[in-house]
Amino acid sequence: MLIGIDARAASHPQYGGFKTYTEGLIQGLAALDGPHGVRLFVDRPYQPAFPLPAHFKTVIVQGGRGMSAVGWREQVTLPRRSRQEGLDVMHFPCNSGPVWPPPSAVLTIHDLIPVLQRPRPPATLATREWRQFFIASYSTMTM
């Protein structure tokens, strides 16, 4: 099985929950002795603090320049590259992934407790209309 991981959080110098989770995931998979290949998709050179086995490959996928670079990478460049690599499954570990993901994808969602416990303010008319449009658009999509 060929596994892809959106590992850009691990390649960033800033510490935090996404980086810790992604590095832990990579380290855990690296410790397994199995026949699986792993592709780590990063947006800059990545040198982990632990050795990567031979069946791991780091792939730099950049999104471009400017404010839209992260969105373009996530929505267009990364799904395209993951299909080119012939992955069996792609894991997006940081709360977001492409609208049209690869055929087999896993998305990890973190920190839902505050969302579930916090009372939501009433939606404005514009918000309700946008939700209805968005849901109607998605319900008519064919994949």
Residue ranges and their predicted role:
Residues 1-143:
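Carbohydrate transferase catalytic cores enriched for Leloir-type hexosyltransferases
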